[in-house]
Amino acid sequence: MTEQEHLALAMERAKIRLRQGIGTQSERLVHSTLKYYLEPDESCHEIPIGSYVADIFQKETGQIIEIQTKGFDRLRDKLDYFLKDYHVTVVHPIVREKYLCWVDPETGEVVSRRKSPRKGRATDILPEIYRLPKLQNHPNLSFAALLMDVEEFRLLDGWNIDKKRGSHRMERYPTAIDSIVRVDAPSDFAALLPELPMEFTRKDLAKAIKLSATTTAYAVRVWERAGSIVQIGKSGRQYLYKRSN
């Protein structure tokens, strides 16, 4: 079975599950599809452990997988409990490439389809990891940035003249899994650093990883906690950094 066939089968199984009303009320297609993609054995899904429920629990290895699109801070209590006895991998889906499909709300017809200029990168996981300062370097915790391509369907029901601003998203459909970038130890964070001068500022980093100044500041703190970079001084008003030896 090819990767594409594996993903397509996972999505079909997820659609059936959601139609039958199985799973959490707020579960969306992407989350459910990735559960089947990462662990086809349905008996490993949504397993109660203590007062929490693991997205995936692989009994033979004692491994837990949590799929979290955003808001890693909401995982703190659950991770605190799980990490005492199990190894946990937090998988963060990142949209690498997206096609936007606009749907007429009256006819249901797709009236336009275009490629979004925004491209996701593995470094997009860093601002989320920033929310877990006490757990980031825990020996039982791994992170995985899952880069995927999607088609997103939105209703043309927004408030501005072209009906796009404030529009409602109908659903996202995963079309391809590009890669999975794992961080299994603090030393692995260094591999997420882009090409940079020997000495660099946050502004240099923001340009290289294509994040805003604020989110780049969060990423810098993650790299500092991991020991990937160190602050060495200032250049004007900006802090200077270098890679750790």
Language-model regions: role of each:
Residues 1-52:
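Acidic-basic catalytic patches of nuclease active cores, encompassing PD-(D/E)XK
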Residues 196-208:
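Short acidic, hydrophobic short linear motifs in intrinsically disordered regions
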Residues 211-224:
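Short amphipathic alpha-helical interaction segments
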